[in-house]
Regions:
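Portal/gating segments that form or line small-molecule/metal binding sites
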Residues: 1-89, 99-139
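Extracellular, beta-strand-rich glycan-interacting domains
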Residues: 96
């Protein structure tokens, strides 16, 4: 199972705020969450919660790799995911496609200045109303 392999997840402040910081408990049994934000932890945030707030993706990647040890570092999509992809630090992209068409929304990787190519999917798992895909990032 993929979730068992993740040691640390990197998210942006938007995801952290939308989830209310998962009430201080990282999601899906993940050990640590690194939050990229120019703002500090929310007032009253438990300093013992396994969340680390950093200013940029370089600090986030370094901290996440140290915290994860030999486990996977996962990066959420959105602006932070796009920044890490643009920095050439993403090995693979996993996405789940569901049959819902939105009229508008946010870009999967925020705003990217350059084109980034993905290989054909090397994993395709069809579930009930969901398609799980994994793509290697071309270098």
């Amino acid at each position: 199972p993929y979730w068992d392999q993740i040691g640390t997840t990197i998210v942006g402040r938007h995801v952290f705020d939308m989830t209310d910081g998962w009430d201080g408990q990282p999601p899906s049994g993940i050990d640590h969450v690194v939050v990229v934000s120019h703002r500090p932890a929310p007032e009253g945030w438990d300093p013992e919660a396994p969340f680390l707030f950093v200013d940029d993706i370089e600090a986030a990647l370094a901290a996440a790799q140290e915290l994860a040890g030999d486990r996977i570092v996962e990066v959420a999509a959105g602006d932070v995911g796009g920044q890490v992809l643009a920095a050439g630090m993403i090995d693979e992209v996993r996405m789940d496609v569901v049959p819902v068409v939105m009229g508008a929304g946010k870009r999967f990787f925020g705003s990217l200045d350059a084109q980034h190519m993905l290989d054909d999917p090397d994993v395709v798992i069809q579930g009930d109303r969901v398609l799980h895909l994994r793509f290697r990032v071309r270098r």
